[in-house]
Amino acid sequence: MKICCLSDLHGTLLPVEDYFEPCELVCICGDISPLNIQGNHRKMRHWLINTFKPWCESLPCDKVIFIAGNHDSCMHNEDFMYAQFPKDSKVTYLFHESYIYTSRSGKEYSIFGTPYCKLFGNWAFMEMDEILEKLYSTIPENLDILLSHDQPFGYGDIILEDIYWNTGEHIGNKPLAKAILEKQPKYLFCGHLHSTDHSCIEIGNTKRYNVSIKSEKYEPVYDPLVIKI
């Protein structure tokens, strides 16, 4: 099955004809909100319904699944999100939960999406390590696809750009790394740390991909990942 994955749109909805080839499934790993309105929930709801949703519906695929990121505080309103992006529609929102996608061939793929990130600053969906461990303990074992906004600690989580706050150290999520080693999903697609390693990195039996499309300066520099699973 061919899928397309991307993350960290920050309001940039890439031209469909230029960036997307036909596939079955598109996965978006959070930080969808435009930076200039991310804190205005009324404007964000309007943008999600009138701009983001039609864009997703225009993508050349059968299904779009997306999760929130730390810049998507409006997505804490689960009632609104589930009403606009239900599981039985083309465009589905997952909030730390599972979904079974049935492919054109009839094969079922188990998917779990989680928005949570390690704590820093006053952003959405961020928790202390003790809480993250409890949250990640609910991730099922042997998933086909895990969608996470945050990246696991120790696996390609060093910023590669030469920017003033780059320490050259691993800055990923330790409870997430532990959960992945225990749960062993086949694929992990993530973002959040824009310019870390975008190649396939193996975590045990898990193939991890950073699918962010932005640089640390919020410029669109990476193409969406297209992969057959």
PLM regions: where:
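Binuclear metal-dependent phosphoesterase catalytic core
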Residues: S98-S105, P175-K183, Y187, H194-I229
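Short, conserved loop/helix-junction motifs that constitute active-site signature segments
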Residues: Y19-E21, W55-C61, Q84-D88, I139-P140, ...
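Short, electropositive alpha-helical surface patch
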Residues: E78-L94, N166, H170-I171, I201-E216
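Active-site-proximal segments of metal-dependent phosphoesterases and phosphodiesterases across multiple
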Residues: S33, I37-I49, N142-Q184
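Active-site neighborhood of phospho(di)ester-bond hydrolases with catalytic His/Asp-centered motifs
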Residues: C5-S7, V26-D31, K63-N70, L94-H96, ...
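Binuclear metal-dependent hydrolase catalytic cores centered on His/Asp/Glu-rich metal-binding motifs
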Residues: K107-I145, W165-K174
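Core catalytic region of metal-dependent phosphoesterases/phosphodiesterases
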Residues: L6, G11-S103
